[in-house]
Amino acid sequence: MHMDIVSLAWAALMVVFTFSLSLVVWGRSGL
């Protein structure tokens, strides 16, 4: 159960990081 929570937290963190990174790149490239 603990591993599931940790892996889920990591997955959520990666999703947020990837989303924010792509958003920054998209915004800087000239919307």
Swiss-Prot record:
Swiss-Prot/TrEMBL keywords: Chloroplast, Electron transport, Membrane, Photosynthesis, Plastid, Thylakoid, Transmembrane, Transmembrane helix, Transport
GO molecular function: electron transporter, transferring electrons within cytochrome b6/f complex of photosystem II activity
Membrane-spanning parts: 5-25
Keyword Iron-sulfur among record annotations: no
GO BP of this protein: cytochrome complex assembly; photosynthesis
Mode of membrane association: Single-pass membrane protein
One Gene Ontology CC term in the entry: cytochrome b6f complex
Record has Cell inner membrane as a keyword: no
Subcellular location per the Swiss-Prot or TrEMBL entry: Plastid, Chloroplast thylakoid membrane
Principal location class: plastid
SUPFAM superfamilies xrefs: PetN subunit of the cytochrome b6f complex
UniProt-listed HAMAP family: Cytb6_f_PetN
Functional note: Component of the cytochrome b6-f complex, which mediates electron transfer between photosystem II (PSII) and photosystem I (PSI), cyclic electron flow around PSI, and state transitions.
Protein name listed in UniProt: Cytochrome b6-f complex subunit 8
Source organism (scientific name): Acorus calamus (Sweet flag)
